[in-house]
């Protein structure tokens, strides 16, 4: 499902004579606002910092809202490298809709270049910190000429963690999975997880691990999950068979 919203956003921000370029440029050099919550372990390991965070609250398709914009220093999560970077352009996006967003691209256009953000697996009521896909750095005073949400896709059916079948315990670098039914589960079990703290998800990326061949009744298996931590990871959904 794809839908562009650039023109609609511009009309919305022109109400009262306030142009989009002016309204969003203010977000890029205004006084710092309240930063999102940080995962405790990751904050200590990578000295995550949010700077010049300013509220935007710009509506996008399917209930998405561009919530904040600013600068991020810490682990770069979007390509799985966890490389420590400084002053990366970031946005936070909230899902005010009633369905989980499977994928969306957020494009923030300037006079000379476009910042690109991608999100996966954003449930209703959740917010996510997104880092610019090409590691674009934050520069105060940039003017924004357009904001789009493109290639927005919703899950055809709401995803499930299958809590009636599986118990999944995140650990540091591992996931422990137990079949809590009285029957064998045949076929692969694929577990999707994200980094999180409180109500904030971190990174557009959704990680996954596979339990090949399923689990026998009552069986527990531990599998390597390189980006997982006991305190800072959340199971988003699981597919069975």
Predicted regions and their residues:
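Short acidic/proline- and small/hydrophobic-mixed sequence motifs that coincide with surface turns
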Residues: 98-103, 182-187, 200-202
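Intrinsically disordered, low-complexity Pro/Gly/Ser/Thr-rich segments with frequent PxxP/GP/PP motifs
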Residues: 113-140, 201-230
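N-terminal Sec-pathway targeting helices
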Residues: 3-20
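Asparagine-centered strand-capping/turn motif at beta-strand->loop junctions
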Residues: 92-98, 176-182, 195
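Hydrophobic single-pass membrane-insertion segments
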Residues: 27-37
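Low-complexity, acidic Ser/Thr/Pro/Gly-rich terminal tails and inter-domain linkers that flank the onset
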Residues: 36-86, 148-171
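Hydrophobic beta-strand segments
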Residues: 104-108, 188-192
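Short, surface-exposed ligand- or partner-binding patches at beta-edge/loop junctions that are enriched
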Residues: 136-156, 227-241
